[in-house]
């Protein structure tokens, strides 16, 4: 070879590129060795020797750094794919923990998105739409890349299995039938209306018939059995004012017609409900 030709023939790895000063047979198959043809760290851009004969012994081994598109065919095992930043990081069948090594990201398939005891709730990752398949999804095959899992904790109370509603961030987070305690949770937001729709009663415990939807829903309260303050969120205004906050009209009448029982005390008045008259006449 000419002296100006770049070559991988080098007995020392001191420089990234060496000027060819060794015999032409150095990079031929019969003398190829680590001391003669070293893919890394002497060379970081190529995996094969600069020679007319492509020597298989100069291919890179299956390591994280030299595993490029030009030398993955000789890697062992065969599932050493590109990094997890690439869509085709791992295939479904040969994907193992010691086989797919990420370069700049976490691997796409390693841990399940759901809990161990809820195999049916393994949903897709919020970052990778096709992370998990519905049929072949296993404990070592699903994980979100940059977000939290879609399903872990229920939005509703433990004793109300039928109230598991959708999350305000992920509308299709929970389905109505397989929704369990370890399968529903809002990811980045609160539920649709401040609190779960059918978990916390808007009314008092003594009046079960008035326990309607959340105070964000139109059919929240009925005038006969609604209670204020502690059961109503400050972020959601009730559609109807609690009955105990609305004194009767005679309360603001002259003192002669005012009864002591017509105006509730201050403790019954919430921040969102004010009496019809500013001060009881009686």
UniProtKB/Swiss-Prot annotation:
This is Keratin-associated protein 10-1. In the hair cortex, hair keratin intermediate filaments are embedded in an interfilamentous matrix, consisting of hair keratin-associated proteins (KRTAP), which are essential for the formation of a rigid and resistant hair shaft through their extensive disulfide bond cross-linking with abundant cysteine residues of hair keratins. The matrix proteins include the high-sulfur and high-glycine-tyrosine keratins. Restricted to a narrow region of the hair fiber cuticle, lying approximately 20 cell layers above the apex of the dermal papilla of the hair root; not detected in any other tissues. InterPro entries: KAP. It holds the Pfam family Keratin_B2_2. It comes from Homo sapiens (Human). Belongs to the KRTAP type 10 family. It comes from the Eukaryota. Interacts with hair keratins. Coiled coil: none annotated. Keywords: Keratin, Repeat. Residues 26-266 are annotated as: 24 X 5 AA repeats of C-C-X(3). Sequence repeats lie at residues 26-30, 31-35, 36-40, 57-61, 79-83, 89-93, 99-103, 104-108, 109-113, 121-125, 131-135, 141-145, 146-150, 163-167, 173-177, 183-187, 193-197, 198-202, 210-214, 220-224, 225-229, 244-248, 251-255, 262-266. One of its GO terms (cellular component) is keratin filament.
